[in-house]
Amino acid sequence: MTEAAALIILAGALVIGLGAIGAAIGVALLGGKFLEGAARQPELLPMLRTQFFVVMGLVDAIPMIGVGIGMYILFALGA
């Protein structure tokens, strides 16, 4: 394996791994703020829950895009 091929594999792994770590941190912060808001104003719980799930879905879409780009890097460029 050449050095360039090894760096391409490393780049693909970093895209997938760091995207997943970033999304996990984002969902954790989002969940904490959701619980704070729900505890502070329980009457707003339905609105907060809807916004929470919409934003959580958007945050979770980022690692899926990263997986697609990482797989492209690994299989299309790494071959």
Curated annotation (Swiss-Prot):
Compartment list: Cell inner membrane
Q: Does the keyword Transport apply?
A: yes
Residue ranges of the TM segments: 7-27, 53-73
Q: Which domain of life is it from?
A: Bacteria
Q: Name one Pfam family in it.
A: ATP-synt_C
The annotated site for Reversibly protonated during proton transport falls at 60
Bilayer topology term: Multi-pass membrane protein
**What GO cellular component is one of the record's annotations?**
proton-transporting ATP synthase complex
The role this protein plays is: F(1)F(0) ATP synthase produces ATP from ADP in the presence of a proton or sodium gradient. F-type ATPases consist of two structural domains, F(1) containing the extramembraneous catalytic core and F(0) containing the membrane proton channel, linked together by a central stalk and a peripheral stalk. During catalysis, ATP synthesis in the catalytic domain of F(1) is coupled via a rotary mechanism of the central stalk subunits to proton translocation. Key component of the F(0) channel; it plays a direct role in translocation across the membrane. A homomeric c-ring of between 10-14 subunits forms the central stalk rotor element with the F(1) delta and epsilon subunits.
Q: What is this protein called?
A: ATP synthase subunit c
- A GO molecular function for this record? proton-transporting ATP synthase activity, rotational mechanism
- The scientific name of the source species is Cellvibrio japonicus (strain Ueda107) (Pseudomonas fluorescens subsp. cellulosa)
Q: What HAMAP family would the database entry show?
A: ATP_synth_c_bact
Q: Name the CDD domains on file.
A: ATP-synt_Fo_c_ATPE (cd18185)
Membership in a protein family: Belongs to the ATPase C chain family.
What are the protein's UniProt keywords? ATP synthesis, Cell inner membrane, Cell membrane, CF(0), Hydrogen ion transport, Ion transport, Lipid-binding, Membrane, Transmembrane, Transmembrane helix, Transport
SUPFAM superfamilies the UniProt entry points to: F1F0 ATP synthase subunit C (SSF81333)
Summary of subunit composition and partner proteins: F-type ATPases have 2 components, F(1) - the catalytic core - and F(0) - the membrane proton channel. F(1) has five subunits: alpha(3), beta(3), gamma(1), delta(1), epsilon(1). F(0) has three main subunits: a(1), b(2) and c(10-14). The alpha and beta chains form an alternating ring which encloses part of the gamma chain. F(1) is attached to F(0) by a central stalk formed by the gamma and epsilon chains, while a peripheral stalk is formed by the delta and b chains.
